[in-house]
């Protein structure tokens, strides 16, 4: 009988199974790590441990992986399934020599030398009983629970106290065939493999647990005694005519107001509550791109998460997902408005640090905050902040606030050694709890101050919220970004280290725009967002069920055959399944009559549904604009369509943070897809297949309100070419209100003053707001915008502009 089948081992495994709850990272190793099920597989573990191997054996069957107790049989030879780098640590004395374990590596390499067709996948496996990072001061708790190499007695205590928080992490496989072919099969290579594996396990532990935590007061005193803060305190005392002791006390107050007080114990408790909450709220949380972020952590990058901001849920969702993906929840920059009892202290213990909405003119506060942020970066804590500054009330990305990005870039300029990488994150929901509140705020109602009662009010409304979506976008490594934008930045900073570079502000603006673009590049298309996109483009927000399903199939075809980026995710299924999901979530309603089913958006939530449409409108705006060209111009040519898109794309790019690299190519691909789908034919120009015209009209409707805004702006500029930016914003907003009242436009963003402000900035950048000979361009774009509108809407705009500016 084998050792693991003995009564003693079976009893231990039974007891451990009762005490242990294991979380696997990543959740689907075969899929996420590209493991080949047809190739033999062996596990590499850091330390020989009965409990670790038992925990691994409990999950391998469910994952379709071989049991660690099952020997590796290759060509009649048998080898251990698990290779350990070092033996178990005895209660007393030294660990046994690692020669036995080196021999295990050598035996596997030897088999490859004898069998050229063989390729064993060597999969590193890390186990973590709890994820306590430890404190900078050694404590009894650390002595009992936080050691990397516990004795069997300490391991028993760890299982007893932390067994419900056991994580098993699989890493990308190493091909032993590649190692044997490239480096040979002798003892030297086995030793090298062991060294590389040790470094890997050490880095992996840091990714999973994070750096050790400082004592809060010790951190404060270290910061307050830094040269930068000493100087700021002296300046504060001189400028405010107070003593240095008073200025120092004020700096300590600021630190206490700002700083997080991370508690691993609270995070473990919060994990249980959030697991219950997500299971109550959502049917599932869809994640894309986590493996790339894990790799950046593993490679030693300082990670800064920059998510979009839809809801207060964002704080919880991203931290929860990162925890379950084997990464440490970040320190989160939260608005000081969230520092109310009891949420504030809990957020602070969960890693939140608080920032005032504005601290312009308060030099001491600015210096304290910057030094604290620098300390987080230096010590290796991941950080999260929202570049939009607040939650989007319309579902579109807001114009970025650049303060935190500027501080981050400054940290790099001041000599940050480790690579600093921004990770854009798209957060999406089938239901955002605050949507109704957003609509009231956009209608002029004053925003309520956050309080504990709002939290309880939100908890009362918990229900079926469908799915959540977390997509990690393309990372931006700041050292690489600086090298691309300003190749000689290091030399310039070295010459004048105290001087703020003139190029820093425009570079921060470029970086902010790139962050927002990368967030939108990682958008998640769901049944709710796509269904709202279709129905809100229809006349009465209603369609026959068969027509809606057909239209959804067309959009899915566009999104899957012509993916926006590799970071974008698209819901699985077809039009029928998407409609069914929308009905189950009560986002759309079904009415039946003898002629068939009608699907519609209830009038009471039609405005709220624009929020979900706006989450993904940028993905479909160019196909919609192409459809608009086809429906409004008979026999239009391919080149004419491309020219029209070229005129409007810079405005779309500024408004929707789009990053299409080659619009000409994309337009050509869209037209080819329309031909393949039997929507149009192409001879001298394009002709619409009469029976399919409704599909193109519906698609064109998505960009309709955007074109109306552009028509308002360019009609004003054509009549008043010398109009100032502020006047253009005011007049555009006034005409938009009139147009909305006459034609029933209810989308909140149509009346958003900030949107017209952002467009006017882009118009100035493009040269349309100056006397430099761009009048011809203005006239051309006005004609093109007018030509893509319904005649009634066009006439309203032209007449209103003429009446307002007769002189």
From Swiss-Prot:
Q: What is its EC number?
A: 2.3.1.15
Which reactions is this enzyme annotated as catalysing? sn-glycerol 3-phosphate + an acyl-CoA = a 1-acyl-sn-glycero-3-phosphate + CoA
What SMART domains does the annotation carry?
A: PlsC
Q: Where in the cell is it found?
A: Cell inner membrane
Which pathway features in its UniProt record? Phospholipid metabolism; CDP-diacylglycerol biosynthesis; CDP-diacylglycerol from sn-glycerol 3-phosphate: step 1/3
| Keyword flag Cell inner membrane | yes
The residue stretches assigned to a coiled coil in this entry are none
Alphabetical list of Pfam families matching this protein: Acyltransferase (PF01553), GPAT_C (PF19277)
Gene Ontology BP annotations: CDP-diacylglycerol biosynthetic process; fatty acid metabolic process
Q: What is its main location?
A: membrane
Q: Which UniProt keywords apply?
A: Acyltransferase, Cell inner membrane, Cell membrane, Lipid biosynthesis, Lipid metabolism, Membrane, Phospholipid biosynthesis, Phospholipid metabolism, Transferase
Q: How does it sit in the membrane?
A: Peripheral membrane protein
The GO terms describing molecular function are:
glycerol-3-phosphate O-acyltransferase activity
A cellular component annotation (GO) from this entry: plasma membrane
Leading EC class: transferase
KW ATP-binding (keyword) present: no
Q: Where is this motif: HXXXXD motif?
A: 308-313
Q: Which SUPFAM superfamilies match?
A: Glycerol-3-phosphate (1)-acyltransferase (SSF69593)
Q: Which domain of life is it from?
A: Bacteria
Q: Which PANTHER family match?
A: DIHYDROXYACETONE PHOSPHATE ACYLTRANSFERASE, GLYCEROL-3-PHOSPHATE ACYLTRANSFERASE
Per the entry's comment, what about the domains? The HXXXXD motif is essential for acyltransferase activity and may constitute the binding site for the phosphate moiety of the glycerol-3-phosphate.
Q: Which HAMAP family match?
A: Glyc3P_acyltrans
The UniProt similarity line reads: Belongs to the GPAT/DAPAT family.
Protein name listed in UniProt: Glycerol-3-phosphate acyltransferase
What is the protein's species of origin?
Shewanella sediminis (strain HAW-EB3)
